[in-house]
UniProtKB/Swiss-Prot annotation:
GO molecular function: metal ion binding; metallopeptidase activity
GO BP field: proteolysis
Taxonomic source organism: Haemophilus influenzae (strain PittEE)
Name of protein: UPF0758 protein CGSHiEE_07200
UniProt keywords, alphabetically: Hydrolase, Metal-binding, Metalloprotease, Protease, Zinc
Source species taxonomy: Bacteria, Pseudomonadati, Pseudomonadota, Gammaproteobacteria, Pasteurellales
PANTHER family: DNA REPAIR PROTEIN RADC, UPF0758 PROTEIN YEES-RELATED
Membrane-spanning segments: none
InterPro entries named among the record's database cross-references: MPN, RadC_JAB, RuvA_2-like, UPF0758, UPF0758_CS, UPF0758_N
UniProt motif JAMM motif: location: 170-183
Binding positions for Zn(2+) per the UniProt entry: 170, 172, 183
SUPFAM superfamilies hit by this protein: RuvA domain 2-like
Length: 221
């Protein structure tokens, strides 16, 4: 039977909202119950200690996840479903709301898309003239540098879907979001090519493990 301490995260969420909870408290709500000799709060802390972070837990594969005492295939399936629902929610939010009005949603969307990638992925969000999402495309994979990213391919795709604006994004698997000189050079080349076709590059976001670096917010566009 769960003790009062085990119920605290649920009560805290109802009183203060989910943002007020720590990682282990959120995980405890997801797990719901502990195992023999280990109440859910303790289990949650043990799981996070084992993986090292919430990020590592969420990006673990089935074998690694289910190898931890107290976790199993049911929780793995539920977690995968929750992650996918989050991605779809954010995408639907972006389809219905002008992106420029909600930059935090864009960051969250890109984090869910790219933060777990082990290789660099270059993604482009194609937007209409009201800055609503038309579609997203992963255009380039592998080491992202000037020779690997082709502005003409991006502009060709933008013209095909009648995009009026673009948001560029790529991840740094290292987790370090500071842009390199190559990142800045790529951005400038794409921006110059887009301007020739009267297409606006709104931002270039570098995605790390838990946050994003915005070129626009740092006056690099």
């Amino acid at each position: 039977m769960e003790n009062n301490d085990d119920l605290m995260p649920r009560e805290k969420l109802l009183a203060s909202g989910a943002k007020a909870l720590s990682d282990y408290e959120l995980l405890a709500i997801f797990l719901r119950t502990g195992i023999k000799g280990c109440p859910v709060i303790s289990l949650s802390k043990n799981v996070l200690t084992h993986f090292g972070s919430l990020h590592a837990l969420l990006s673990s594969d089935k074998k690694a996840f289910c190898s931890v005492k107290g976790l199993g295939i049911t929780q793995f399936i539920q977690l995968q479903a929750i992650t996918e629902m989050t991605k779809r929610y954010l995408k639907q939010e972006m389809l219905s709301t002008p992106i420029i009005n909600d930059p935090e949603t864009v960051k969250l969307f890109l984090l869910t898309e790219l933060q777990h990638e082990e290789r660099e992925v270059f993604m482009v969000l194609f937007l209409d003239n009201q800055h609503r999402l038309i579609k997203k495309e992963r255009l380039f994979l592998g080491t992202i540098n000037v020779s690997a990213v082709y502005p003409r391919e991006i502009i060709k795709e933008a013209l095909y879907c009648n995009a009026a604006a673009l948001i560029l994004a790529h991840n740094h698997p290292s987790g370090v979001t500071e842009p390199s000189y190559s990142d800045q050079l790529i951005t400038k080349k794409i921006q110059d090519a887009a301007e020739l076709m009267e297409i606006c590059v709104l931002d270039h976001l570098i995605v790390g493990k838990s946050d994003c670096y915005s070129f626009a917010e740092n006056c690099l566009l």
